[in-house]
Amino acid sequence: MAVFLRRFLWLISFTLVLTDDNSVENKFYIAGVVEYRPTFMGGTSEQLLQANLAGYLEIMASGNGTTDIIVFPEATLNSVITLTAVPKFTEQSLCEEQGDDDPEIAPFLRSLACAAREYGTYLVVNVKERVSEQCTSDETCSSRGYSIHNTNVVFDRQGAVISRYRKWNLYLEPSTNRTESPEIATFTTDFNVTFGHFICFDMLFYTPAQDLVEQLGIRHVIVTKMFNSELPFLTASQFQQGWAWANRVNLLASGGSLPQGGISGSGIYAGQQGALARLMITDELVGQRKLLLAKVPLDPEEPIATDEILEPEIMTPVKLKLLQQPELKNFTTWELPMVRGSSVDKRICQEDLCCEFRVTWTLEDTQPEYNYRLGVWVGQRRYEEEQYSAIRLCGLFACKGASVESCGLVSEEEVHLQDHRVVFTDLQILGEFVRRPRRLILPSTLSSSSFYALQPSQLAWSMEELANVTRIKMELRQPHSQLMTFAIYGNYFDEYANGGAGRLGTLLFLLITPLIMMHLFRE
């Protein structure tokens, strides 16, 4: 009997060890995001499509079947000349044709379904989709008889379509249609993760991005991007990391790679644990095709037992074409005196936002490469079209010259000498941000050497909810000699619907229809 009990207890303990090992393994999944340089010149539309498809298949093969999910970026595959239908769901793999399939499903989409099956991975791609119009009269039909959508399509490991999303917030896409109402797209995997997904410009607005996180509780998010970076607060990887941090979610962000047009930036981020993999092409005019891989925790707040990514501080010329924040002239700012061994405590206010700054710095030369300003801004910013965000921010940012208009410009002499730097040894920002039902407040940080955000070992962040405000403290954990941006960035999605700054003209612009708005701007 004693022997039996010993053997029984040994068997139980062995089983528990196996169970524990499996549970450790099952705490992660392997994700890949692709920074992709599209082929867009040098052939017919069909030839360009085939060249991009070949690039996609080559990248998928390079993963060697190790990934659980691969994400490709926005607008890097087909064009409005080589459209495809996209089914919402399919019971069977799209790899083989079924009798009731839409005849407008293009062969390239089937090739990708076959690749998903071959490599046993979930696959997210972005396509230009053709949707035949169901017209009841000539008045309801467009001249071309079909609509075009900017669409994400998701395949499971067998190549079946399990999710589709059509972009809601369009950005400089005159030939693309919107759906009648926004779509909220999710899918659940066999590794017990439910993903939400959207496209590029959507990330700056509440719907659908924040709907996924706040209304549905999604903690794993995918975004396909062709993002134009803007200094000092909205470069691609900087914004991706801040967004994942503020929402405490895992984010898989796949970006197009056209640095000559200001487009680059991909990464995998685990909430407030920072970047697990990331890439910004800043020192070249030609983009890359690269698969970034990371072991992603099922729980974004579960501590990761891997070394933090800290890129080397190697200064190289910045060739990435960058946009500039359009409202800098309206900031309330104060210029830091470029005096060696200085320290300052400063309180700056604008409208309902006051921020307290504590800064200590030293110079490694009497003529540093950048000047710096402390600034606060409450206002509304415009993007390239008649689309707006209400912003509250306060921070420190680099300026090419003495004027505030030079902030967010990269120095032309991008041979960053070691002795031309400003070293910040102490930096703290304390801000009280008015509470609103729908807003997102995130850390916005950027290093001039790498164009990446600061990692958790370099940044401390805390939030305290009070009666009418949220008190946020942001602090530099260690000295830093290559800061471009160190700021608290608040996006207030419903500012005017919730008793905001009271700009009546802006409120009216938000209420009238886009057609009338375009007419007014033309006038």
Curated annotation (Swiss-Prot):
Its main location: membrane. The keyword Signal applies. Pfam families: CN_hydrolase, Vanin_C. Residues 29-298 form the CN hydrolase domain. A lipid is attached at residue 498 (GPI-anchor amidated asparagine). The active site is at 74 (proton acceptor), 167 (proton donor), 200 (nucleophile). It comes from the Eukaryota. Residues 1-19 form the signal peptide. It is a lipid-anchor; GPI-anchor. Expressed in third instar larvae. It is found in: Cell membrane. GO terms for cellular component: plasma membrane; side of membrane. It is an enzyme of class 3 (hydrolase). Glycans are attached at residues 64, 177, 192, 330, 468. PANTHER family: BIOTINIDASE, BIOTINIDASE-RELATED. Belongs to the carbon-nitrogen hydrolase superfamily. BTD/VNN family. This is Vanin-like protein 3. It comes from Drosophila melanogaster (Fruit fly). The lineage of its organism: Eukaryota, Metazoa, Ecdysozoa, Arthropoda, Hexapoda.
